[in-house]
Amino acid sequence: MDASVIVVGAGPAGLMLAGELRLGGVDVMVLEQLSQRTGESRGLGFTARTMEVFDQRGILPAFGPVETSTQGHFGGRPVDFGVLEGAHYGVKAVPQSTTESVLEEWALGRGAELLRGHTVRALTDEGDHVVVEVEGPDGPRSLTTRYVVGCDGGRSTVRKAAGFDFPGTSANREMFLADIRGCEITPRPIGETVPLGMVMSAPLGDGVDRIIVCERGAPARRRTGPPPYQEVAAAWQRLTGQDISHGEPVWVSAFGDPARQVSAYRRGRVLLAGDSAHVHLPAGGQGMNVSVQDSVNLGWKLAAVVSGRAPAGLLDTYHEERHPVGRRLLMNTQAQGMLFLSGDEMQPLRDVLSELIRYDEVSRHLAGMVSGLDIRYEVDGGDHPLPGMRMPHQELVRADGKTSTTELLHPARGVLLDIADDADVREAATGWSDRVDIVTASLHDAPPQGPLSEARAVLVRPDGYVAWISPGSRAGLTEALDRWFGPAR
């Protein structure tokens, strides 16, 4: 085998997955078509759940001070993310190019292998391994691996070569994006519906502004390259009245509003993550964030299966958990597209939504959906509200000093948090101690009515989601350990 796992694509999804696999002790090779990183940034920031994920792996400090904004939107209607409870709420502005740089350094620092300038031409699932045909700087070569994961974007070669069904709708609108230097542009950070379409603008720093413009009635077009800047400037002037033709274009692109998702995230030994599995209108900055979270869900499971710590059936839970998340992503981005991009016939609905958002419960629902903080997986954890949800950040005190639930997840292992100092709980988990860290610690400054207020013990998966909780007895603990971490040893 050339590598236990080959990941195709060195964007945020592929690099995050590579790092997760290395944390799980699996050798991984990343194949990237581009010979060097691009400075272009489609994504401009993180949502709250992605910040938590990066913090759980110790990556977040590499992005600088955690300065977040609580101002978000849903279809151009302002939403206050401050109504959410969490370690980090709101949105942190970070260009995608910076995210890729940080994740590449993190993954390579843990031993991942990255081959740039390598294009996948074909692949064959042989049942017990996969053969990948690659064109590289030194010519064609065949690589063998136990599993392949396509993280190669909306036009995924892996998805097509492996025969994944990709139902949904193609783009029916075209939007322009341009990063421009030398123009004074009024900020419209959450977008603005104007008589002829929708416009959005925001400063990126260093004298560069980003604009997005969608002219109503402009059909989707198959382009072989970026649109001419003057075409973008003309559309901007028609919609806003502002002449930006004298600006210096740093980057120009066009995109649409497709809504497609693969029917299955896995076919045999080939899996998909990120835009390879789902494409959608980039509304609310969700695309990169959902992609990273796909990889964090898959990484520990694939590592456990490859290393023999868990049965292959664990991989089925990747589709079971992430496909509904992707489906909901398409639903909410389509709804936002209707609000953003439709004509005056949609104005009554916009006005009603603006009224509803004033209620905290509505804002909390929409903010939770866009941020990813409201995701709950089916983990058979009983009636307690926490199983299946993300583990909240909580300061802890143990015999050797202070720690936190976030810090305990840095190694990407399971964690059994013994809050009540219960020897029976610790004894029950000893057969999994090679895969699960058993930690005795008390809660520090926990809110009296918080989610952990009555917990005696909590089992947390490597991706930070609660698999089991004990308000009283240890019933169900060994079953949860067996389900998520394989048989006792």
Segments (PLM) and residue ranges:
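Core Rossmann-like FAD-binding/catalytic domain of the broad FAD-dependent monooxygenase superfamily
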Residues: 1-350, 354-361
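Helical substrate-recognition/capping region of FAD-dependent monooxygenase/halogenase enzymes
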Residues: 1-4, 8, 24, 33, ...
